[in-house]
Amino acid sequence: MRPPLTSRLAGFGTSVFAEVTALAREHGAVNLGQGYPDFDGPQFVKDAAAAAMRDGHNQYAPMPGLPALQRAVADHQRRFYGIELDPASEVTIHPGATGALCATFAALLDPGDEAIVLEPFYDAYRPGIALAQARAVVVPLAPPAFRLEAATLEAAVTPRTRLLVLNSPGNPSGRVLDASELEA
């Protein structure tokens, strides 16, 4: 019988988030694993969501996202970070990080390419890269500072390197890379 998963996903087990969720349920604990607050959402947010559905905003959105939301994201980036973006061509809205990452890896990586990831990292990086038939190259960031050393990063780069996954603040460390690390 053929295994249920493709060979590209062999060796990837349950995510740490699924394990934490199961343990929290089993022991009646608060789940700090992945956005499970122990309080209800604000009523005004729930009311706005219900009103939007009543007003007919309950169909599939355009592939890149609703234009008003794309504009709001571009405005936010300009206002807070001084980054000018064209909402129609440079902002894509996605319903979740994991799906967005997989789509990005599939769009940017060819079979045999390498993607550098800084460790510790979000556990969806490796399987997403594997689905693109590429290879994750891990660059460890040593605790407690989790600093990115330019020499360590440079040593990981090969002719097959196509992508550097740079997430700041880091997930799960929360570490924000400083200007000297980003410039190196």
Label each residue range with its predicted role.
Residues V137, L141-A184:
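Active-site phosphate-binding strand-loop segment of PLP-dependent enzymes
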